[in-house]
A protein has these predicted regions:
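Active-site phosphate-binding strand-loop segment of PLP-dependent enzymes
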Residues: 60-127
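Phosphate-binding glycine-rich loop
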Residues: 1-33, 169
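Short beta->alpha connector loops at strand-helix junctions that form conserved
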Residues: 38, 57-61
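Helix C-cap/helix->beta junction micro-motif
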Residues: 51, 110-111, 141
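Aromatic/hydrophobic pocket-lining residues that form π-stacking "cages" and hydrophobic walls in ligand
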Residues: 44, 104, 134
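Substrate-binding/gating loop at the entrance of the active-site cleft, primarily
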Residues: 14-18, 22-25, 35-53
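Conserved core segment of the aminotransferase class I/II
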Residues: 139-183
Length: 183
């Protein structure tokens, strides 16, 4: 995906779900808000709440399930700590365009919030669609992105909970600290 990480910038997890939940505990807490484009996978909401943060639901465009950047802009507050995106999306199957991800990245840099990029379905693209990793845009975006992936979907290994998170070293260190006390 055009991404480079050192050994200190990656951690394994008991599935991508655990990686996302651990990341939430590191980057968000009471009083914080995490943007969540909807419809979305049901577990994101509870992971945000378990971290003590508040999910802020942001509708996607109804014509193609693409990110609605105007709605995202309107939802950003000084308490916004992150946005969780899943592309290709669960449950819609929408593959967010490079253009919309670049616009989202600009917002993350401007307002200094994280992008939690769930890329578990990256290999499941059809009809000429192309997956694009938001962290590949620039170093500034890479530093604000936690890329999460795993092997269960692409390799039909759903019973094998093998996931990982990739991010800057201080975030990964925090995720590993959470994992050391929860697994």
């Amino acid at each position: 995906n055009g991404l480079d990480y050192t050994v200190n910038e990656v951690t394994t997890a008991v599935g991508a779900k655990q990686a996302i939940a651990s990341a939430m505990m590191v980057i968000a807490g009471p009083g914080d808000e995490v943007l969540l484009p909807i419809p979305c996978w049901v577990s994101y909401t509870e992971m945000i709440r378990l971290a003590g943060a508040t999910p802020v639901f942001v509708p996607v465009r109804q014509d193609n399930y693409e990110l609605d950047l105007d709605a995202i802009r309107a939802a950003i507050t000084p308490r916004t700590k992150a946005i969780v995106i899943c592309t290709p999306n669960n449950p819609t199957g929408a593959v967010y365009s490079e253009k919309s991800l670049r616009e989202l990245a600009d917002l993350a840099v401007k307002h200094d919030f994280f992008i939690v990029a769930d890329e578990i379905y990256e290999k499941m693209v059809y009809d000429g669609a192309k997956h694009f990793s938001v962290a590949s845009i620039s170093r500034e975006v890479w530093e604000r992105t936690i890329t999460v992936n795993g092997f269960s979907k692409a390799y039909a290994m759903t019973g094998w909970r093998i996931g990982y998170a990739a991010a800057r070293a201080d975030v990964i260190k925090g995720i590993m600290a959470v994992q050391s006390q929860t697994t």
